[in-house]
């Protein structure tokens, strides 16, 4: 039974891989939803790569799921949150976005489609801008994934998150896509008991 469950689980991972055109199934992580996916990234990336005074760039149209985790990190580590403004048409001001980058910018996290305005943000262009500054990019695809083709390799997204229920999947399931080279650099988000029980005096592996 456990083997069958594992096979079904990995088959689901392959389905998601094909759906978003990830390079491999090891780049697909299952979570409890978009919110947990973002919290995972903020926690792991923030702990590993961000110090007091470092900066994250988000947009003015983010869902609270992509605001509050960064605010908590700011309270805990003293990072700065920079916000991309928009015009009267509900479009992000890309010239202002470019100006927000500094040597302290560590990551950008922006929604692909606004859940309030319906604005489709040019995330492929925005990712290219971030990469030109050597900065990784998180795409919140919770609202875009049901309505448009999302190809992580075409976007060149470093991370991308969404929830299964948005595409008629089960509730309580989410996806975190991450490029393998980034996932390999992130520390564990949570721990668990594996096949052996390490002594509290020993380090975890």
Task: List the predicted regions and their residue ranges.
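N-terminal low-complexity segments that are often proline-rich with Ser/Thr-Pro
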Residues: 203-205
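Pyridoxal 5′-phosphate
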Residues: 1-197, 201
């Amino acid at each position: 039974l456990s083997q069958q469950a594992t096979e079904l689980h990995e088959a689901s991972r392959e389905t998601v891989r094909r759906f978003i055109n990830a390079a491999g199934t090891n780049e697909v992580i299952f979570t409890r939803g978009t919110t947990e996916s973002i919290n995972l990234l903020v926690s792991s990336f923030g702990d590993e790569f961000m110090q007091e005074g470092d900066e994250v760039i988000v947009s003015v149209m983010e869902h609270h799921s992509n605001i509050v985790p960064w605010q908590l990190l700011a309270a805990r580590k003293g990072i700065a949150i920079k916000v991309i403004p928009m015009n009267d048409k509900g479009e992000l001001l890309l010239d202002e976005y470019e100006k927000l980058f500094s040597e302290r910018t560590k990551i950008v996290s922006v929604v692909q489609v606004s859940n309030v305005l319906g604005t489709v943000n040019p995330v492929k262009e925005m990712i290219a801008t971030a990469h030109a500054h050597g900065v990784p990019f998180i795409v919140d695809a919770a609202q875009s994934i049901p309505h448009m083709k999302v190809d992580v390799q075409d976007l060149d997204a470093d991370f991308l998150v969404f929830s299964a229920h948005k595409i008629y999947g089960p509730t309580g399931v989410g996806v975190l896509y991450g490029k393998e080279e980034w996932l390999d650099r992130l520390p564990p988000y949570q721990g668990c008991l594996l096949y052996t029980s390490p002594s509290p005096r020993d380090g975890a592996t």
